[in-house]
Every structure is written in C-alpha cells, then in structure tokens.
Amino acid sequence: SYEGKLKAWAALGANLPTRLVDLEPLTGDLTLEGHRFELKGGPAALADRHYLWQAESRALLGGVLLFQQEHVWVADTPTPDDRAAWIDLLDEMAALQPELVVPGHRLPGTAADASAIAATREYLLAFEEELDKAADGASLTEALVGRYPDNGMRIAAQIGAKVAKGEMKWG
C-alpha cells in the first residue's frame, strides 16, 4: 500500500514522496520528435516490467529493470521465478546491443552504456546465491553489502532481503 511504502521509506527524510500520483500505463510504442520508441518487455511473469528501445539511436531506457552502482530493488520480485524472468529480460536487452543505456536507478557519474545491464544481471545472480546461504534477512543484507560495498540505496538490499526471506510483505 502507499501508506506502507511511506513508512518503509521514512529513511528518505526530505526526499520522501509527499503525494500519490495516478499514472496511466503506456500500452504501445511511443513517438517523440519523429523518433519511435518501442515498448518492450512485459512477459507474463513480469507483466508490469517494460523498457523502451529506440533502434535508430540504439538507445535503451531501462526504467526499473536497470540499476547501476545501486543495490537492486528486488522487493517487487519476491520469488526466484520472478527474478529469473527479470534475468531473461536483461538477456533480451543485451541482445539488442544498445550503445546508450539509461538505467532507472544509478549513482551520478556512472556510465550510460550496456554495463548497467550486466551489473543488474550479475547482482540478481549474486542475490540468488547469497539468498540460498543466508539464514535470515539481516545476514542476506550483510552479504549483499559485503559484495557491493560501494553501491548506493542500501535500503533496497535491506527490504529485498526481508521480503525474500519471508520476514516482510511488500506491494
């Protein structure tokens, strides 16, 4: 719920959202200044996960599917099957061989290239590996922070770990 997310995001302080915005989903391709952006993704397992591909410029707008030097937000994909479907989408993105890649979440100054696809994929695989070894959410968080000490958005590691270990409901 919105209220639950506000409570979970309290650590954002002044950056905490102050209002709920109703969004209208994009259901097809988008044209901007004569350039067509293809709406891709959204497989049955992750029907709400899409990205935009602009073939002419070889540009990919990854949205919530891509992270660069941030802990990956996995709370919305609580099962191994969800995360496997995400990895499949990342493989689909990589196969396009994009030259410009814009992740939905990244630290300032990070590269705007396909390394975000590889980084997100590697993190998801590491998450599964550490999940199998961790006794609880706290130990999973510790393992993820240990593997990615310079990544931002630690709250993503904390909440994702709790959700994956069944200690917290999300969404």
Locations of regions flagged by a protein language model:
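Metallo-beta-lactamase
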Residues: 1-118, 122-129
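Short, charge-rich amphipathic segments
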Residues: 10-29, 52, 62-80, 155
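Short flexible/disordered coil segments
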Residues: 16-22, 28, 53, 101-102, ...
